[in-house]
């Protein structure tokens, strides 16, 4: 995994800077399975995880909930039969912050 998994999220206030285009290009390479989506003008990171059944998808969702509480940074989560869609963005700045990439990397690590 990347060095992002060793980092902790920092408190993100409404005046915190969003990632720049250069930072985005660098950080997205560190979480290659994630894509950037824009919804309602807000840039977000998103990944769909596949599972063999609903129970495994739910177990992953619960591990992700624990991680989100530990870091005090919370994603959008859609749990369905055989898949979980995870979306990270920083609500306070209405866009992407380094925290979102840290959490994307840590979310990937939950599969190990």
UniProtKB/Swiss-Prot annotation:
Catalytic activity: (4aS,6R)-4a-hydroxy-L-erythro-5,6,7,8-tetrahydrobiopterin = (6R)-L-erythro-6,7-dihydrobiopterin + H2O
UniProt-listed GO biological process terms: tetrahydrobiopterin biosynthetic process
Domain of life: Bacteria
GO molecular function terms noted in the UniProt entry: 4-alpha-hydroxytetrahydrobiopterin dehydratase activity
Pfam families to which the protein is assigned, alphabetical: Pterin_4a (PF01329)
EC nos: 4.2.1.96
Family: Belongs to the pterin-4-alpha-carbinolamine dehydratase family.
Name of the protein: Putative pterin-4-alpha-carbinolamine dehydratase
């Amino acid at each position: 995994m990347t060095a992002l998994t060793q980092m902790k999220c920092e408190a993100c206030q409404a005046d915190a800077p969003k990632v720049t285009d250069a930072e985005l290009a660098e950080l997205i390479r560190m979480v290659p399975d994630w894509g950037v989506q824009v919804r309602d003008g807000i840039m977000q990171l998103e990944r769909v995880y596949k599972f063999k059944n609903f129970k495994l998808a739910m177990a992953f969702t619960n591990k992700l909930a624990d991680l989100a509480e530990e870091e005090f940074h919370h994603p959008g989560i859609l749990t369905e039969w055989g898949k979980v869609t995870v979306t990270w963005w920083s609500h306070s700045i209405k866009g992407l912050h380094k925290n979102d990439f840290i959490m994307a990397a840590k979310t990937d690590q939950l599969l190990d």
